[in-house]
Amino acid sequence: MAENRRKSENIRRANRVIQTRTFVLMLVLGVAVFLVLALKLYQLQIKQHDYYQSKALDQQTRSTVVTASRGTIYDRNGNELAVSATAETVFLSPKELAEELEKPETKWTKESLSAGLSQLLGVTQESILEQMERTYSQYEVVKLRVDEDTANAVRELLNDNEVHGVYLETDAKRYYPYGSLAAHVIGFVGTDNTGLYGLEAQYEEELQGQTGLVVSAKDNGGNALPYEYEQYYASHNGDDLVLTLDTNVQYYLEKYVKEMADQFEAANGATGIVMDVKTGGVLGMVSYPNYDLNNYSEVSDARLKAAIEDGSASLADQQLRQWRNKALNDTYEPGSTFKILTLSAALEEGVVDMSSTFECSGSITVMGQTIHCSNTSGHGHQTLKEATGNSCNPAFINCGLGLGTDTFYEYMRSFGLLEGSGIDLAGEATGIFMAQSDFSQLDLACYAFGQNFNVTPISLIAAQAACINGGYLYQPHVVEQIRDSSGAVVYQHDNTPLRQVVSQQTSATARECLEYVVSDGGGRNGQVKGYRIGGKTGTADKVKTGDV
């Protein structure tokens, strides 16, 4: 009896062990399964959330971009220099086309549709077929910004063949009404309507605007649901630029710069700037050779084209040459035009005045080096005005030596030559100067009449303007105002001068000397009846470079 009870107890104990182990095993398996499911859910809902959300939205919605109109660029008088004309972009949805091809009633094939689009759009049939194969995509651009006639022909092709999956959307094409006028200032946009050069690139953020979006719902068959299911995100047109440029000034500046460049066979081109000396606003800026903004990739200058044809230069190199704005991208020796600054600094420091006289024998020796005047026989006895009119090198060397190396160098800094003008155009080069610690008396003598250093034309004209406008240095600029699409002014250029470099009296005396250059000196051909004209002739020794 006792033996039976012991056996029964052992059996129960064994059963409890088995039950416990089974429970533990089930628990472990349950936890493991739960962890696997939790991990999978984490992967699906957290790590791959964006992916699956995108796929779901892709199945349920269709998005159409609403293009923003790029801002207009105006000259100071309201003339349109760059505008956005309406155009249309042709795109296809490979996914939708693939679904259409599965329907028995479809009238077209990949080959027939791609051939038709290729013929109308001038795009290879192979590239269109490649786009059609990308069935994971809903948006493949076939041709950007086609004209109205082409767009209508595409619509006719789609309607005749009942094609669903190829669409046209309104876009904007950049157009430059004046062609090549002010090309190097305005610049141009690329095929994606993004600014690449000039103001188009410098003010890309302001001009481009913000695209909008129409999100429409689709049913399980891929068909669009009624408009009440749409969400519309409005586009915002770009801001407009109002420039300081005057198209009349620009036209004549381009005309005469080209004439001079051709007359003197300037192989490397020429540049010219007209500036309002009281504000620093650029009224005209020319870089020659020029190009057509509406066809910016075509090299139009005969000499540049000849170099491409004879193999001495590549198309890309010549394109870069014609796009280069020599007024601010390149540096030159200023030659005698720099004497305006030497004159103003010497007057301001009391080194010379209108009673000063100079003797010119045709040369001067500094630190054992003989420096010649342009008139090698000498100008003889001269007043300050006469020395300016004669552009006498020894006279201006004496002005520079009277200032001393440190004072002269500080005037170059004060005139803004050492750090660049800060004009609101990209790519301004910096001048090339001897370090102040190495600046000797001989260097000073050469600098005083504009030799042995380089400046950009824009920096030089800003400094020259300070000599005659009462002594104030202004920052050169080409954008006077920015307006939003409603016409409200969102930016107005501040015409406060950066600093005063010389006094009103010094500036008045400098103007008198420069007027003498035109009335009685070497610049007589610059006279204009009825106007007070001042000027300064100047030629650096490096004419062999082919620049004007």
Model-derived regions, located:
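Periplasmic/cell-envelope proteins involved in peptidoglycan metabolism and beta-lactam response
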Residues: 1-302, 331, 406-414, 526-529, ...
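Beta-lactam-recognizing serine transpeptidase/beta-lactamase-like catalytic domain environment
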Residues: 5-6, 82, 88, 219-232, ...
